[in-house]
């Protein structure tokens, strides 16, 4: 059933960890879960232009630490940190805890499945040919080090009368192999003819250690090796300001 299940959910606790990282006492769980859902919904709505890959929420003692992974951290921070203050106030209205906002830069958006799916959705909304958008995304991902990528586009593609599914794959994407580091992202394009669904699977190699934090460590090491640390630097600059 590896082809049917969400590849991130399948690997949780093996080499992937959750995007919400906290423990709740009995009776608090549903309240905090709904808080997380509202926070993510509001942030994604307000940061449409910031190319947000994922939002991680941690809750140390009486705090709510929100880490935004973005390909355009400058858009999130704004001039002299003005926009990030607005975001902090926005999130503070949704939770009783003290809010801390961190920004992490996504160094290679071309191999981030969520950002690739969003990019294709935006191109379809601008009436770019779906085959061209898919092929361009596949070529960029392979060029930047992905070992395999698969893209599915479904709906009334090109304004066709009958909805259909088109897919494009290059390299290999082993969905059954649990040690495989497979990133997965979905997006919806709202076109004049209706909605089109985009699904993206990107295979980035294998993670041999059995540790839920292994994938996070791998991405941090890749960022550091590629001259990363931009997100950390921006956090320090913001805190200093």
From Swiss-Prot:
List the keywords (alphabetical): Ribonucleoprotein, Ribosomal protein, RNA-binding, rRNA-binding
Highest taxon of the source? Bacteria
All copies of the KH type-2 domain together span: 39-107
Q: Which GO terms describe its molecular function?
A: mRNA binding; rRNA binding; structural constituent of ribosome
Which positions carry the signal peptide feature in this UniProt record? none
Record-linked NCBIfam families:
rpsC_bact
Biological function: Binds the lower part of the 30S subunit head. Binds mRNA in the 70S ribosome, positioning it for translation.
Q: What is this protein called?
A: Small ribosomal subunit protein uS3
The species this protein was found in: Beijerinckia indica subsp. indica (strain ATCC 9039 / DSM 1715 / NCIMB 8712)
Source organism lineage? Answer: Bacteria, Pseudomonadati, Pseudomonadota, Alphaproteobacteria, Hyphomicrobiales
